[in-house]
């Protein structure tokens, strides 16, 4: 979490994932993260742009849109499984003043707002490489082979490949999945390098590269 991120002396970009919000709400969690990052090299980004060394970074959580599947039947099954198995909808609130819980509808609304924000940013001229950083995955290419066809994939992945082919950032970094990814959507390299869970000190993702360095 933030204590880990604060120990780095280099600029560190922090994009909240779903677990950051557990036991709290969307508004309070973001405010707390920004407060905790003060006085450090950590930049907490949510629909925020940051430029460094001639590179433009665009970052947002990018909650799932639950439109991954084409057929209504598959979408309905995905929503049913999500509400049955995903803890986001029981452990995340919306604001500190109301008891309303996070829902797939709110997730989709936030997704659409984030995509509109990205569209606006890519509509602005920038003479240099652009890196997008999200928590949730932007392409079915990030689905692990053993989970292909699972209705729960809608909770992890949205399909922004058409937009990526138009925008063509040089790099898209994401989290949420528990396996490593490195593939291309057009000229955009999509990379995930998660540690995964670490029960009893063991790293879930054996392909995790703690010193991964990406050059572009």
List the model feature ranges, each with a label.
Residues 35-53, 57-59:
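Metallo-beta-lactamase
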Residues 20, 50-51, 62-65, 136-140, ...:
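Short, solvent-exposed loop/turn segments at secondary-structure junctions
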Residues 37-42, 117-129, 162-170:
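A structural motif corresponding to the C-terminal end of an alpha-helix
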Residues 58-131, 136-147:
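Active-site-proximal loop/helix segment associated with metal-binding centers of metalloenzymes
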Residues 51, 144, 150-170, 178-216:
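Binuclear metal-dependent phosphoesterase catalytic core
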Residues 1-9, 18-39, 52, 68-70, ...:
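Metal-dependent catalytic neighborhoods of phosphoester/phosphodiester hydrolases
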Residues 25-29, 106-117, 152-156:
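Soluble or luminal CAZymes and related metallo-dependent hydrolases
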Residues 13-18, 43-47, 131-134, 164, ...:
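Active-site neighborhood of phospho(di)ester-bond hydrolases with catalytic His/Asp-centered motifs
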């Amino acid at each position: 979490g933030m204590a880990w991120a604060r120990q780095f002396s280099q600029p560190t970009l922090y994009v909240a994932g779903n677990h950051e919000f557990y036991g709290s709400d969307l508004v309070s969690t973001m405010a707390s993260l920004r407060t905790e990052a003060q006085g450090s090299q950590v930049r907490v980004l949510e629909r925020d742009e940051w430029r460094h060394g001639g590179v433009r970074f665009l970052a947002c959580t990018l909650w799932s849109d639950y439109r991954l599947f084409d057929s209504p039947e598959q979408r309905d099954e995905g929503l049913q499984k999500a509400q049955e198995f995903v803890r986001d909808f029981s452990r995340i609130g919306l604001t500190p003043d109301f008891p309303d819980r996070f829902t797939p509808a709110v997730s989709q609304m936030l997704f659409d707002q984030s995509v509109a924000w990205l569209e606006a940013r890519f509509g602005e001229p920038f003479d240099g490489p652009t890196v997008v950083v999200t928590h949730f995955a932007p392409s079915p290419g990030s689905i692990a082979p053993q989970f292909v066809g699972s209705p729960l994939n809608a909770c992890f992945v949205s399909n922004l490949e058409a937009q990526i082919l138009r925008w063509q950032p040089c790099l898209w970094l994401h989290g949420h999945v528990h396996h490593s990814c490195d593939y291309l959507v057009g000229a955009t390299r999509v990379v995930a390098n998660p540690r995964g869970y670490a029960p009893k000190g063991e790293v879930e993702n054996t392909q995790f590269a703690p010193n991964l360095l990406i050059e572009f």
